[in-house]
Amino acid sequence: MDEFHRCGKEDSFWQQCFLYPLFFQEDLYAISHDHYLDVSSSSRPMEHLSSNDQLSFLTVKRLIGQIRQQNHSIVLFVNCDPNPLADRKKSFYSESVLEALTLVLEVPFSIWSKYSVEGMNESKSFRSIHSIFPFLEDKFPHSNSILDARIPYSIHPEILVRTFRRWIRDAPSLHPLRSVLYEYRNSPDNLQRSIIVVPRVNTRFFLFLWNYYVCECESILFSRLKRSSHSRSLTHGSFPQRTHFHRKIKHIIIFSRRNSLKSIWSLKDPKIHYVRYGERPIIAIKGAHLLVKKCRYYLLIFRQFYFHLWSEPYRVCSHQLSKNCSSSPGYFLRVRMNPILVRTKMLDELFIADLITDEIDPIVPIVPIIGLLATEKFCDISGRPISKLSWTSLTDDDILDRFDQIWRNLFHYYSGSFDRDGLYRIKYILSLSCAKTLACKHKSTIRVVRKELGPELFKKSFSKEREFYSLRFSSKAAARSQRERIWHSDISQINPLANSWQKIQDLKIENLFDQ
């Protein structure tokens, strides 16, 4: 792969015009063979790997020839052979071909995405969930409306192939891709008869399709948004009681005047801001209601024009931050006016002004969380804890670990909110539900369970909580404001409760538009 990248850097035209001969390079299939064995070795016995999974390059080349045929004689996604040995060998060669196809397509895509990102000076972003929180603190208070959009995850295979043709000139190299996509579309497992680009299965091929599809959507959308918002306004800004992130420092510009030691700090404030996590992008807009309606209409037309997709109106929702709450990612978000005293000195302290700034206020969605806990049988609809009967067959350690994992996930995820009083109600529900589950298992009472376990209930998460507050209210942090937020860095993904709540909200919006 390093050799392919070096060739692409020297001559990108060669990469775009001569990709097809790479399919007949034996080194490519050796790489895909090793990668497939590394992935599957954890789930299959070693004796199967040594006896039946020997790679034959002659068989691979014959397999490539079968892919080019119109009758689709090779089955890549569904194995219908009743013989388990032949079924495993067919799956082995099919996965090798898919790995090789992905490797070939990744070479020009990685080079193109690298140079496209380097050329976008003002669209650089951190590719992590941790960058969402400083983005919300910086950009949302300077906006008055947001667009909550969802990326369409179903697309026709021919449209997907045509998007590849925009940056790959080697048409023969796309024939195997077209055959693979159509075969997946016509497979019995795919009932929608379309390509689902969301990677529901963790394979390299589907992950590549999703990354390419999102990159293609955003690259075209960013170029159009830049043209529409070419006039940028400069407003004075300050960051009181905020951590200096690298992203924030980059947005500061210093204008120096001749024969003067003074400097004016100004904040670049574009009118349109974009953030995405998963398949849910959010566009924050500062402008009149007409501008918001135009942006919403443009997003709907954009998908129809470039990807020939009919988007339902509920997939692009607009609302004002001052009147409604938004959700991203799994939070209720609102913007409130918070009077903060900021001293502004100008021209040798001749003028002092007090500025009023907007502040983002993440709210813990207590009522939806209680509703989801009731759905999962941790409590009733009113929030009264009940025993989790389906877990009574587990061991005591497994029950404690599962409850502890749920609480630790919720506490870490919502620790950046100002108002965390509702979290202690959730902790009470989970702790009492855990005690009732153990009491139901041992046919005892809650008092006996608490007396026997004592501090063992949520021991791991409570220790994390104590470390969190000891760090926050230490002697060094005592001088800081008690309303300073600390975002935990333990977040690796959105918690399942937030995903479930988001699905419920989507169904409500869909039913509202259907009426």
Swiss-Prot record:
Main location (coarse class): plastid
Record GO terms (molecular function): RNA binding
Pfam families referenced in this protein's UniProt entry, alphabetically: Intron_maturas2 (PF01348), MatK_N (PF01824)
InterPro entries: Domain_X, Maturase_MatK, Maturase_MatK_N
Region forming the signal peptide: none
Protein's name according to its UniProt entry: Maturase K
PANTHER family reported in the protein's UniProt record: MATURASE K
Keywords attached to this entry: Chloroplast, mRNA processing, Plastid, RNA-binding, tRNA processing
